[in-house]
Amino acid sequence: MYTYLMLTMRTEKFNQEHVAGHYEFLDRLQAEKRLKMFGPFSDATGGAYVIEADSLEEAAEIGHADPLVASGSSELTIKEWKLKK
């Protein structure tokens, strides 16, 4: 498993109605033990979450299933994160 930082930044099309679905999406990732941490940015421009996945392709598939991203409300950037322990 690899660790990925998932950055979701609001777009001009941001719609608050998709936020509840976003949190349900994160709850599912947490139940699957993939989600390590998450939270919004203090300036309300978006947020980030950290997941574990087998590949960048799998991380992208997961990230594009996020209702905020799928709706166009947020733009997704994914970075593999080589955490030091």
UniProtKB/Swiss-Prot annotation:
Domain of life: Bacteria
Family to which the UniProt record says this protein belongs: Belongs to the YciI family.
The name this protein goes by in its record: Uncharacterized protein YjpA
Organism whose genome encodes this protein: Bacillus subtilis (strain 168)
